[in-house]
Amino acid sequence: MKESTHKLMTLDFWRICIANFLLYAAVWMLLPILPAQCYLMGLNTQEISVSFLLFVGGMIGVGPLHAFLGDAFKRKYVLLLFTLAVALCFSGWLIVTAVWEVKLLMMLAGASFGIATTAGITIGIDITQSHRRGVGNRIYAFSGALGLLVGICCLSPLYLLLVFKNLVIISLVLFLLSLVVVTSIYVAFRAPVGVGIFNIDRFFLSLAWVPAINVCILSFGIGLLHNLLPPYAWIGILMVVVLAALTAPLTRLFVKLSHHCQRGTANTTLQLATQTGLILGLVEGERIANNLLFGCITILLAVLMFVTVTWPYFKQKRVRP
């Protein structure tokens, strides 16, 4: 029997948050260690950078398809299918040997992850009562940030203790658990409204382009700091914790720049900016000699941009009170 949605934390809402947490943890426990694994496979720095750019390109490239997929097909099935697709892409690291295979896997994984995260955001909103969707959106966004935090700071360091194959298996178990949780969620049927195949709705919030750039710069600096070795490694971990803690207030800021029915788009835009910056920072950190200096400078620039550009822009352009 379907549970009442008059309260926010319904069983289905808890389930979609748990599934989102598991999805992010599964992805982000592997992403930080893939550059090192690529080096072991014989890839050079340029090939690794291109591979991760393809991951980001995959996330961005499928963006115009989000609205169509969410309208033409059942969103729960879209989430299940593309979560499974991400899992299959990461399982491919157990057999991949050639550079072109790495690039293909990364591009497909990025595209699938982008669609899965957007489908999850949409479901999280759909199963929440309209007057609670603002709070629900922030809680859902934080569940992903918490998964990212656990993946980067708690699970990826296992690379120092376990062989890569075992880490992939752990990641696949998390993917499987996420799939199992999603199957138990009730999502009410919504009749298609006839959205075109290519549409930036549910992908990028145009009014949020300034804070999106700001978040991307901040995440880039944090990605650089995450590459630090002991005794400075704690700085990178601390900054990832800070980034996760900022997710809820940043989600609120992005949502206040959105019009009616654009909460999900605001969340998707924030997630895209955050993950793009982090991924680029993790990869470029392999090439930069002084990550501590450049990371701190980048974060300071991001803070300065927020105070002098983003916040005044937000006060001028905000749509919601």
Task: Locate each region found by the language model.
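Residue-level signature of mid-helix packing/kink "hotspots" within the transmembrane helices
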Residues: 56-64, 148-149, 278-279
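Conserved MFS/SLC helix-loop-helix module at the cytosolic interface between two early adjacent transmembrane helices
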Residues: 61-94
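A late C-terminal transmembrane helix in Major Facilitator Superfamily
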Residues: 262-289
